[in-house]
């Protein structure tokens, strides 16, 4: 009987874990001049140690991973000059780039997950570089 309950209990904990996590990206759209710096805000809610991610979706393409954080140095270096900083006290994982190029125009998604939970994505921030 107990063996039959284990899969059900496992599903319960995964679903409970997924319900407890959320991601907020307060800026739906950001317009920035080429060569200027960029910061995209991400706040998360998660009761345990989070895995944090930033993804980018360029026009007519799928999601691509920019960077991820689990532990260690709170400043994470990503691809193409992007970096993000983890702040446990502020529950934030803001993405930054010192100087943007027109090719950085895309939609950026922050995401959180736990050890045994699915990714929970923010609503995305559309970046337009002029």
UniProtKB/Swiss-Prot annotation:
<keyword id="KW-0391">Immunity</keyword>
<feature type="region of interest" description="V segment">
    <location>
        <begin position="21"/>
        <end position="114"/>
    </location>
</feature>
<dbReference type="InterPro" id="IPR036179">
    <property type="entry name" value="Ig-like_dom_sf"/>
</dbReference>
<dbReference type="GO" id="GO:0042101">
    <property type="term" value="C:T cell receptor complex"/>
</dbReference>
<feature type="glycosylation site" description="N-linked (GlcNAc...) asparagine">
    <location>
        <position position="90"/>
    </location>
</feature>
<dbReference type="InterPro" id="IPR003599">
    <property type="entry name" value="Ig_sub"/>
</dbReference>
<dbReference type="InterPro" id="IPR013106">
    <property type="entry name" value="Ig_V-set"/>
</dbReference>
<dbReference type="InterPro" id="IPR013783">
    <property type="entry name" value="Ig-like_fold"/>
</dbReference>
<protein>
    <recommendedName>
        <fullName>T-cell receptor alpha chain V region PHDS58</fullName>
    </recommendedName>
</protein>
<keyword id="KW-1064">Adaptive immunity</keyword>
<keyword id="KW-1279">T cell receptor</keyword>
<dbReference type="GO" id="GO:0002250">
    <property type="term" value="P:adaptive immune response"/>
</dbReference>
<dbReference type="InterPro" id="IPR007110">
    <property type="entry name" value="Ig-like_dom"/>
</dbReference>
<keyword id="KW-0732">Signal</keyword>
<keyword id="KW-0325">Glycoprotein</keyword>
<keyword id="KW-0675">Receptor</keyword>
<keyword id="KW-0393">Immunoglobulin domain</keyword>
<dbReference type="Pfam" id="PF07686">
    <property type="entry name" value="V-set"/>
</dbReference>
<feature type="signal peptide">
    <location>
        <begin position="1"/>
        <end position="20"/>
    </location>
</feature>
<feature type="region of interest" description="J segment">
    <location>
        <begin position="115"/>
        <end position="130"/>
    </location>
</feature>
<dbReference type="InterPro" id="IPR051287">
    <property type="entry name" value="TCR_variable_region"/>
</dbReference>
């Amino acid at each position: 009987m107990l063996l039959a309950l284990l899969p059900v209990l496992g599903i319960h904990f995964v679903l409970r874990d997924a319900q407890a996590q959320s991601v907020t990206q307060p800026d739906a759209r950001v317009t920035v001049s080429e060569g200027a710096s960029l910061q995209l805000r991400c706040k998360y809610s998660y009761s345990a140690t989070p895995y944090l991610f930033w993804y980018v979706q360029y026009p007519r393409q799928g999601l691509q991973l920019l960077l991820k954080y689990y532990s260690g140095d709170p400043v994470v270096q990503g691809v193409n000059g992007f970096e993000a900083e983890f702040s446990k006290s502020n529950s934030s994982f803001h993405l930054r780039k010192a100087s943007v190029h027109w090719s950085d125009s895309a939609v950026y998604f922050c995401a959180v997950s736990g050890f045994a939970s699915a990714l929970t994505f923010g609503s995305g921030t559309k970046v337009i570089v002029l």
